Amino acid sequence: MAAPQGGYPPQEGYGQPGDYGSPTQQQPGVVAGAAHQGHAGGKKKRAYAGEAFGFGSGANAALGGQPPAGGSYGVYPPQPQAAGYQQPVYGADPHQMNAAAPGYATPASPGVAQMTQQFGAMGMTDPHLMPPQPQQAAVTPQAPRPVPLNQLYPTDLLTQPFNVAELDYPPPPIVLPPGTSVYPSPQANCPPTYVRSTLNAVPTTHSLLKKSKLPFALVIQPYAALHDAEDPIQVIPDQVISRCRRCRSYINPFVTFMDHGHRWRCNMCNLTNDVPQAFDWDSALQKPADRSLRPDLNHAVVEFVAPQEYMVRPPQPLVYLFLIDVSYASVTNGLLATSARCIKESLDRIPNADRRTRLGFIAVDSSLHYFSIPRDGSENSDPRMLVVSDLEEPFLPIPGDLLVTLSECRENIETFLDKLQEMFQNTQNNGCAMGSALRAGYKLISPVGGKMTVLSSSLPNIGHGALTMREDKKVLGTSKESSLLQTANSFYKSFAVECSKAQVSVDMFLFSSQYQDVASLSNLPRYTGGQTYFYPGWNAARPEDAIKFAREFSEYLSSEIGLEAVLRVRATTGLRMNTFYGNFFNRSSDLCAFPAFPRDQAYVVEVAIDETVTKPVVCLQTAVLHTTCNGERRIRVLTLALPTTQNLADVYASADQQAIATYFSHKAVERALSSGLEPAREALQAKAVELLSTYRKELAGGSVSGGGLQFPANLRGLPVLFLALIKNLGLRKSAQIPTDMRSAALCLLSTLPLPLLMQYIYPKMYSLHDMPDNAGLPDEQTGEIVLPPPVNLSSERIVPYGLYLIDDGQTQFLWVGRDAVPQLLLDVFGLADRTQLRVGKQNLPELDNDFNQRVRAVIEKSRDHRSKGVGSIVVPHLYVVKEDGEPGLRLWAQTMLVEDRADQSVSLVQWMGSLREKV
């Protein structure tokens, strides 16, 4: 049923009668013409109540200058322009919006002032605070300098506060001198999807870097998706790999050719090298090739197929060894049955192109249960179970049949998985010898290497690596809490290093409803290139829990991982890789070892400037040597070129706030684990103060200019991201956070790819009841679902009749206001009465109305990792939260509103005030 054009008759207490949305009842500041445009669509609309302002000041109004069209879903009265919540107008059309806040028209210094004023008058603002533009856009010269870098735009954080939409802008552009690359390819420099630098203009000296107080680090995410098909890059199959004789860098788009193209000069160390004879020969067509078309000279991201000399041993098969907890806890919560069924249903998805993939299974309670699975077509197709009770020195009964080839034993593996649950369905065994099982598994697969996948619902309580219940509620929130975040048993670190040396990687899937010591167990993935996946209070009896795990585990099994991998970063002479952060084992000063290379993690590398850089451009090259799932040795090379500068203003104007926040997220986790939570939080606050003070002293002329807080526009979100990090589950001060939840959060803070990490620190909130007409529908050009504009995470942005989606990438909350109108509840949930609305984990019903379909499309699109350019297996739970409903759930959802005051933490206004005082 379509609503009448003017919306429904106003409910008691919502809005006044009158011409709903007519130009006479305008919201101040929205031009009458804009009001008419809203109805010009001619489509009939639903309207879910609202004060009688036709357009406007709803959460979605001030962004990009588009008023929500039509009788929007409930709009709320104009926001008071309180300090700290004024909405800057980004690149808005001046005809549509009042020009109350013209961009960044605050005079900076006499030279810049005039230009900034002109930008403001033209409705333009900082070029990289505009909607995303192509990365390599030409930059027009602004001053007589060799190559003008990014312009510094000062803003006042108190009067022009951060807007969440800025987190969707690209980083400051990398401005290279013309002719830097050997061929003018648009793909010559590494896109930010794969590598981001905290500084897109690099100081030439250590002293300038030190003076800036900014970190110089790379955020490296070598893969943009779990599957090759979704992350197509140039592969060079001819095995002609030209490398510098001295520094071992790979040839790349930034080298220079000399001697009529017979030699090339390395852009890292300046050595002249010979071009290999086969470099200009097309081996497939057996004829000379055009060098200017070679992918390694045109693309910053390439993958070489490696010849024999890049192998320590022949490529090994892909091996998955499943260590499954079959104790009482794991049988009763349904983990055993669900994981067996999920492995069986995913057998076709496990990478097996070369038909060499091998699987093995060990069941674990107080004993170890090995399974010998015969080949398909054997006389006896039944799997045999062999039980070993000696946990100190677990031996391998018959190593031959314990790891079986998937292609040869497919049917019998299915038979075994069908029977596995029955074997243990009546167990009363509470023991869990997972440490001993890991040792046994290591013995089994260490000759070939591979993955050990642990599925457990219990604390390992006997055998090797036994742990005790050490969580103490009285310690939570005190300085002693930090000890609970450290490893309780040295076995987990020393064994992890052994695994790394034998090319064995460990992944943990943990499901306990009791304390499970994630802090200790997560060391195994941390040092072996694995990951810890945590499902607190999981129970297969809840369909949402079972489906979430099944979808994630199936994605995990299907992901194409690299094996026997090493990562190294090389750079221009004068730069040195200093510290590496992430899940791997640091084998030597500059080599990171990964028994398996995952596709859903990022790494941070800190760069030191050891000697003065004399070149106008520096290059940093990441290389990942690995074996693909189908047994091919390859090298993925990512080359990033950055301009250098001797000017502090350039360094600040080209700093990438999201890469900086990622670097400090890793630093904060390291600090929390070594010194404690309080020192980690204090270090973040001290850093925010230090950066603001440095900027004020060095670049804002030391003035306090009327009590403001000056910072460049491109870094305006940094103080907010620091506050959000301090308030994150992993770091925030609270006596209510179970240690396992905190440890799992710290794992995420130190492994998530940058786009997901930003969302985990500063979640996305979308206002759904008044979303623009195109939101939740496919974009005409791209076909992608359009999301509503995001809203800042403050309760001031939430109205009592609203419907909001809050999503941190791990969990989604659908917030239903206490005054939501019946029509909204009917359209979204299919319920006539608010009292029938059940809260908690659920999926929205699929109803036959366009608003329900659009809301579901927005929820699904918000979960879409591919559009963010990252790989991830996570499918967040959706929790429905009523504003006046279950208090625990409501408080949990409210912890996402990081700009509010909560528990023992300050609001954004208080935080900015305290920074202002300290600066």
UniProtKB/Swiss-Prot annotation:
Q: Where does Zn(2+) bind?
A: 244, 247, 266, 269
Question: Keywords in UniProt for this one?
Answer: Cytoplasm, Cytoplasmic vesicle, Endoplasmic reticulum, ER-Golgi transport, Golgi apparatus, Membrane, Metal-binding, Protein transport, Transport, Zinc
Q: What does the record say about its membrane topology?
A: Peripheral membrane protein
Query: What GO terms fall under cellular component here?
Result: cis-Golgi network; COPII vesicle coat; endoplasmic reticulum exit site; endoplasmic reticulum membrane; equatorial cell cortex; Golgi membrane
Q: Does the keyword Membrane apply?
A: yes
Identify the stretch(es) annotated as Disordered: 1-45
Which Pfam families does this entry report, sorted A to Z? Gelsolin, Sec23_BS, Sec23_helical, Sec23_trunk, zf-Sec23_Sec24
Q: Which GO terms describe its molecular function?
A: SNARE binding; zinc ion binding
Question: What's the main place this protein lives?
Answer: cytoplasm
Q: Which cysteines form disulfides? A: none
Low complexity: compositionally biased ranges: 1-38
Superkingdom, taxonomy of origin: Eukaryota
Tell me which Gene Ontology terms the entry assigns under biological process: COPII-coated vesicle cargo loading; intracellular protein transport
- InterPro entries, A to Z: ADF-H/Gelsolin-like_dom_sf, Gelsolin-like_dom, Gelsolin-like_dom_sf, Sec23/24_helical_dom, Sec23/24_helical_dom_sf, Sec23/24_trunk_dom, Sec23_24_beta_S, SEC23_SEC24_subfamily
Provide the protein's localization: Cytoplasm; Cytoplasmic vesicle, COPII-coated vesicle membrane; Endoplasmic reticulum membrane; Golgi apparatus membrane
In this chain, the stretch annotated as Zinc finger-like covers 244-269
| PANTHER family assigned | SEC24-RELATED PROTEIN, SECRETORY 24AB, ISOFORM A
Outline what the protein does.
Component of the coat protein complex II (COPII) which promotes the formation of transport vesicles from the endoplasmic reticulum (ER). The coat has two main functions, the physical deformation of the endoplasmic reticulum membrane into vesicles and the selection of cargo molecules.
Assembly and partners?
Answer: The COPII coat is composed of at least 5 proteins: the sec23/24 complex, the sec13/31 complex, and the protein sar1. Golgi apparatus membrane; Peripheral membrane protein; Cytoplasmic side.
Protein family: Belongs to the SEC23/SEC24 family. SEC24 subfamily.
Q: What's the protein name?
A: Protein transport protein sec24
State the species of origin: Aspergillus clavatus (strain ATCC 1007 / CBS 513.65 / DSM 816 / NCTC 3887 / NRRL 1 / QM 1276 / 107)
Q: What is the organism lineage in this UniProt record?
A: Eukaryota, Fungi, Dikarya, Ascomycota, Pezizomycotina
Q: Which gene name belongs to this protein? A: sec24
